From Swiss-Prot:
Organism: Rickettsia rickettsii (strain Sheila Smith)
GO CC list: cytosol
Binding site for NADPH: 14-15, 35, 109, 141, 258, 282, 284
Family membership: Belongs to the NAD-dependent glycerol-3-phosphate dehydrogenase family.
Protein name as it appears in the record: Glycerol-3-phosphate dehydrogenase [NAD(P)+]
EC class: oxidoreductase
Pathway in which this enzyme or protein is active: Membrane lipid metabolism; glycerophospholipid metabolism
Active site: 192 (proton acceptor)
Catalytic activity: sn-glycerol 3-phosphate + NAD(+) = dihydroxyacetone phosphate + NADH + H(+); sn-glycerol 3-phosphate + NADP(+) = dihydroxyacetone phosphate + NADPH + H(+)
GO terms for MF: glycerol-3-phosphate dehydrogenase [NAD(P)+] activity; NAD binding
Sorted UniProt keywords: Cytoplasm, Lipid biosynthesis, Lipid metabolism, NAD, NADP, Nucleotide-binding, Oxidoreductase, Phospholipid biosynthesis, Phospholipid metabolism
Record gene name: gpsA
GO biological process, one term: glycerol-3-phosphate catabolic process
Length: 338
C-alpha cells in the first residue's frame, strides 16, 4: 500500500500537535499548521509546544508554519480544531484551494452548528469532492506525544481511504482499525464528552465505581439511540470499536480528561452557578450539550443521561434538579429496544 508523501495537521493545540507527532513517526514530511507565530517558531527551533504539551519533545523533523498558502500541496490533511471552529476552518481551507487531490482526516469531535448536524453532512456542502475520513480513539494528547501505546478507529465511506490512512498511522505501539460507519464514530466522539461530565460529577458525589461502570453501559445505549436516528449502527458490533467504547471509557475514567475534570469540579463546587459562570477553560462536552438537545428534539428521542447533565450544566435550558442522581442511568438501562 502506498504511503502519503506528505502530511499536514491543521490545528496547533494539544491534540493537533500530538497528532502531528504521531504522523511523524511514519512520515518524514509532516507540517503542523497553526495561527500562533510564536508557537510555530518554538516548534521549529525547540521542538516543544510548552503552552499545550509542556516540555514533551517533538520529533526532530516535524515542521510548523502559519503559511496556509502551501497546505494545498499536502496529500493528507488532518483537521484537529475545536468543534466551534470547524465550519470557519473548512471555509478558510477552501479559500486556499483544497480540492479532491487532498484527503481529509477529521479528528475534531462534536457537531457542526447552524444548523446542528454531523461534520460529514457539513462537508458534503463545503468540500463535496475531497476524500474524507474520521479519526476517533482513546487518545490523551500528552500520551500520544510521548509515543505511549494507543489505538484509534479510522472511518470512511470509502474503505480504501480508511485503510490507506490506517496504514500510514499504524506502528508497533499505535494500533488502528477501520470502519465504514462514519455516523457512529462521530456521534460517539461528541457524546462521550457529555458522559464524562456526568462521570466526574458521580466521582465528586462519591457514587462509587459500580455506578461509574454502569454509566458506561448506559452511555453506550444512548450513543446507539442517536446514531441509529442519524443513520448509523448498521451493525451492532460497531459499538465495540476503539473509537466508541475505548474512547468513552478513557474519557469518563481519566481526570486527565477536561470533561471529567470539569464534572468533578462542578460536583464539589459549593456555588455551582458561580462556578459555571467563571469556568473559562474549553470543555467540549459543555459545548456539545445544546447541539445534542437540538437533535433530541428534532428526532423526538429519549436520552435521560444527556438531559440530566444538561439540567446541571445549562439549567436555563432544562429546569435544574437538586443534583445529579443515578435515576437517569437506571432509566437508560431499563430499555431493551436498543
Amino acid at each position: 500500500m502506498n504511503k502519503f508523501k506528505n502530511i499536514a495537521v491543521y490545528g496547533g493545540g494539544s491534540f493537533g500537535t500530538s497528532l502531528a507527532s504521531l504522523a511523524a513517526q511514519n512520515c518524514n514530511n509532516v507540517t503542523l499548521f497553526l495561527r500562533d507565530e510564536a508557537i510555530a517558531k518554538e516548534i521549529l527551533h525547540n521542538k516543544t509546544n510548552v503552552k499545550y504539551l509542556g516540555d514533551i519533545k517533538l520529533p526532530a523533523h516535524l515542521q510548523a508554519t502559519t503559511n496556509l498558502d502551501i497546505i494545498k500541496d499536502f496529500e493528507l490533511i488532518i483537521i484537529a480544531v475545536p468543534s466551534y471552529a470547524f465550519d470557519d476552518s473548512i471555509k478558510l481551507l477552501k479559500t486556499h484551494s483544497i480540492s479532491k487531490d487532498n484527503t481529509l482526516l477529521i479528528a475534531t469531535k462534536g457537531f457542526a452548528r447552524n444548523p446542528t448536524t454531523l461534520f460529514s453532512d457539513r462537508l458534503k456542502t463545503l468540500l463535496p469532492h475531497s476524500p474524507t475520513a474520521f479519526f476517533v480513539g482513546p487518545n490523551l494528547a500528552k500520551e500520544l506525544a510521548k509515543n505511549l501505546p494507543a489505538s484509534a478507529s479510522i472511518a470512511s465511506l470509502d474503505i480504501d481511504i480508511a485503510n490507506k490512512i490506517a496504514y500510514n498511522l499504524s506502528s508497533k505501539i499505535f494500533t488502528t482499525n477501520v470502519s465504514s460507519d462514519i455516523v457512529t464514530l462521530q456521534v460517539a466522539g461528541a457524546l462521550k464528552n457529555i458522559f464524562a461530565i456526568k462521570s466526574g460529577i458521580d466521582l465528586a458525589r462519591k457514587q462509587g465505581e459500580n455506578a461509574r461502570a454502569t454509566l458506561i453501559v448506559a452511555a453506550l445505549k444512548e450513543i446507539a439511540i442517536l446514531s441509529k436516528a442519524l443513520g448509523g449502527m448498521q451493525k451492532n458490533s460497531d459499538i465495540l470499536l476503539e473509537g466508541v467504547v475505548g474512547d468513552l471509557v478513557l474519557t469518563c475514567y481519566s481526570l486527565g480528561s477536561r470533561n471529567t475534570k470539569f464534572g468533578y469540579e462542578l460536583g464539589i463546587s459549593s456555588d455551582k452557578k458561580q462556578f459555571l459562570q467563571e469556568y473559562k477553560e474549553l470543555v467540549e462536552g459543555r459545548e456539545a450539550l445544546k447541539l445534542v438537545l437540538d437533535l433530541i428534539k428534532k428526532y423526538n428521542l429519549h436520552m435521560p443521561i444527556i438531559s440530566e447533565v444538561a439540567s446541571c450544566v445549562i439549567p436555563y435550558v432544562i429546569p435544574a434538579k437538586a443534583g445529579m442522581t443515578y435515576e437517569s442511568t437506571q432509566q437508560c438501562l431499563r430499555r431493551n429496544d436498543i
